[in-house]
Amino acid sequence: QVLTARTLHGVMQNIRDIVNLKKSEFWNKGGPAWQKIVVCLVFDGIDPCDQNTLDLLATVGIYQDGVMKKDVDARTRLVHIFEYTTQLSVTPNQQLIDPNDNVTTSLPPVQMIFCLKQKNSKKINSHRWLFDGFGRILNPEVCILLDAGTKPGPKSLMSLWEAFYNDKDLGGACGEIHAMLGRGGVFGRKLLNPLVAA
């Protein structure tokens, strides 16, 4: 729950930074910037999924408990797909962030697709759902993959997108990862072994 909140809230803050751009040839052309971004969550199996995480997604409106059916007409469902546009977010500290009048701190609408796979079919299958399933329909210019728990830094998604936008021959890119050491690096001072710290 905390890991999902950390990632999802960081993504929503990054989308806010993109929407707040004043001078952009791409993002401000042909409609609001938020309409050009889709956040797709792919969860690998109902059984291993944490109920608290589903409650978090229900809080922001992406998930609805009780509407899924394991089979329809005696055919087992492969996935359950929910879509929603939300301005709500939950911080890693479990605080609900809702829209407000402050334009710079308020979160913009974010289009979300939540794909909850019936069975745990591993990560490669999840990637296939993203690229083969949703990618063929949405036809995105750029896909950025994040694991739950990864907190994107300020403007980090924008930096990755700019790399692709400015170089049409670019086939892949990766961001830089830093360990979260806690407030004031409390954990960092206790990690004396550099291999453990890495």
From Swiss-Prot:
Recorded GO CC terms: cell septum; plasma membrane
Role, per record: Polymerizes chitin, a structural polymer of the cell wall and septum, by transferring the sugar moiety of UDP-GlcNAc to the non-reducing end of the growing chitin polymer.
Regions annotated as coiled coil: none
Pfam family, one: Chitin_synth_1
InterPro entries with a match to the protein in the record: Chitin_synth, Chitin_synth_fun
Catalytic activity annotation: [(1->4)-N-acetyl-beta-D-glucosaminyl](n) + UDP-N-acetyl-alpha-D-glucosamine = [(1->4)-N-acetyl-beta-D-glucosaminyl](n+1) + UDP + H(+)
Gene name in the database record: CHS2
Protein species of origin: Rhinocladiella atrovirens
Family the UniProt entry places it in: Belongs to the chitin synthase family. Class III subfamily.
Top-rank taxon, per record: Eukaryota
Main location: membrane
Name this polypeptide is given: Chitin synthase 2
